[in-house]
């Protein structure tokens, strides 16, 4: 029994659904047992070309994701080296930011306790401080409030330095 041309089609569909470099993630595999040696070689070459194209595209995507390499020509070794450096820098920044967040949370807790202590010890005096005259005044100078906030903000920033 002879095979038709349709039966001999070689599956070289892209491996977009699978995330495998070897092409094993594909759900369709071609049985090459009935192919000639030349057809098997052509099939193997097509698979290898697809694998190389996938690797090349992955390196291009990686190069474009690294700020110091974006738009630059770079060897694969340079791409890997700069990517590693970028990841290490990002990890360091994340760690520093997490420490800053913890410090700010700690400062917020201290300030909240101070506010609570002031409110409980000076309940009557606090109410007098916020009299209708001061709170209700439409002509309160917003710049003074902004400057006061700015000074407090600067103090907080230098507090842990």
From Swiss-Prot:
Keywords linked to the UniProt accession: Activator, DNA-binding, Nucleus, Phosphoprotein, Repressor, Transcription, Transcription regulation
S-S bonds: none
Gene Ontology MF term list: DNA binding; DNA-binding transcription factor activity; protein heterodimerization activity
Keyword Transcription regulation in record: yes
Localization terms from the record: Nucleus
Tissue note: Embryo, especially in central nervous system.
InterPro entries to which the protein is assigned, alphabetical: bHLH_dom, HLH_DNA-bd_sf
GO cellular component: nucleus; RNA polymerase II transcription regulator complex
PTM annotation (Phosphoserine): residues: 131, 137
Residue ranges with Acidic residues bias: 1-20, 130-147
CDD domains: bHLHzip_Max
GO BP: negative regulation of transcription by RNA polymerase II; positive regulation of transcription by RNA polymerase II; regulation of DNA-templated transcription
Bias type Basic residues, positions: 152-161
Biased composition (Basic and acidic residues): 45-57
bHLH domain: residues covered: 39-90
Residue span of region Disordered: 1-59, 122-161
Subunit organization: Efficient DNA binding requires dimerization with another bHLH protein. Binds DNA as a heterodimer with MYC or MAD.
Family as reported in the entry's similarity comment: Belongs to the MAX family.
Function: Transcription regulator. Forms a sequence-specific DNA-binding protein complex with MYC or MAD which recognizes the core sequence 5'-CAC[GA]TG-3'. The MYC-MAX complex is a transcriptional activator, whereas the MAD-MAX complex is a repressor.
Name of protein: Protein max
Lineage, broadest ranks: Eukaryota, Metazoa, Ecdysozoa, Arthropoda, Hexapoda
């Amino acid at each position: 029994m002879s095979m038709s041309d349709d039966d001999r089609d070689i599956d070289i569909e892209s491996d977009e659904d699978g995330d495998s470099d070897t092409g094993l993630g594909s759900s369709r595999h071609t049985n090459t047992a009935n192919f000639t040696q030349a057809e098997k070689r052509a099939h193997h070459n097509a698979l290898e070309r697809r694998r190389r194209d996938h690797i090349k595209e992955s390196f291009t995507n990686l190069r474009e994701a690294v700020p110091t390499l974006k738009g630059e020509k770079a060897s694969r070794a340079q791409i890997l080296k700069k990517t590693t450096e970028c990841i290490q820098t990002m990890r360091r920044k994340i760690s520093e930011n997490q420490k800053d967040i913890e410090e700010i949370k700690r400062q917020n807790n201290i300030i909240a306790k101070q506010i609570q202590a002031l409110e409980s010890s000076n309940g009557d005096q606090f109410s007098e401080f916020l009299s209708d005259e001061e709170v209700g005044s439409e002509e309160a100078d917003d710049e003074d409030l902004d400057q006061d906030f700015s000074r407090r903000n600067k103090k907080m920033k230098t507090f842990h330095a």
